[in-house]
Amino acid sequence: KVVVLLGTNMDIPVVDRRGRINMERVRLVHGNGGRFSHELTERFILKYFTNDLLAPLHDGAQFPVTAGRMAFSTDSYVVQPAFFPGGNIGKLAVCGTVNDLAMNGAVPQYLSCGLILEEGLAFEELDEILRTMAEMATAANIQIVTGDTKVVKKGEVDKIYINTAGIGMIPDGIDIGPHRVKAGMDIILSGAIGDHSIAVMGQRFGLDLSDSLKTDCAPLNKMVHAVLDKVGSQVALLRDPTRGGLGTVLKEIADQSQVGIKVEETAIPVHDEVQSVCDILGYDPLYLANEGKVVLVVEPAVTDQVLQVLHGFEEGKEAVLIGKTLDKNIGKVGLQTAIGGVRLVDLLGEDQVPRIC
């Protein structure tokens, strides 16, 4: 036999005598909807994603809807590298959408998972990503109930991209949004900023960073709802400072709620390892992405109670009061610096660290 390869993107699967494909790496044939697509689903996806709503493998999930309000959110994840200290793209994909639902005051219930896989992706890596997604879904008490998988030619994506969309129910009495924010409220931050960006950047560029520096990526829904259960009606706004970081979120709050904001630079926690990298490379921690932090705008009367609840969770043990909303300087954020000056915080024109989520 003579085999002629007509180009580098030819999909030449390795098949054994029983007709089973070589399962070490993803091939284009895994995305054609045929037998190998089914084998991929059965051997890897259903290995970790199993529940009654997903089991029928229908074109979508069918689930009961209770009375009340729903929150719906979606996000796509293209982080490079796909694996980084403390997590991977799968952890990010579940926690990111779970946290977006939580920022709406919703209890996360259902999640979709769309996978775009690069030809040649090692199945060992895919397996680890899916396993992590299942672990995070369990931790957040959310079910992955529907999904889709596509395979594209090598070089068209970077290993794996993931889209997740989530649905959650908003409890009665909870009203979270920019419309609730008014002057005189307290601004609380649940912990130190910048860990995620620096952990990803360190992995990407091979920096010699401390082993203790890991992504802060975590599902925040249980912590958030512990706060809402305690003082829900007194919480005006919840935001997670992901892309663009704390500085961007504060500026957006000022613009959307038409208030001024003043925050204390010395009150904002930044871990020493993160600050050191920022000092060396010229990064501003205010604009570094976080994947396990929440900004809360609350009535001053409940600030101490909120901090007490947050301190009871690992994700909130470093929570602090960082500032207040004002009835002047509308749409502006003033950062009271350590040396006594005031610096205006605005939106960045360009990313400091690209592709961190």
For each feature predicted by the language model, list its residue ranges.
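Helix-biased detector of long, well-ordered alpha-helical tracts
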Residues: 7-357
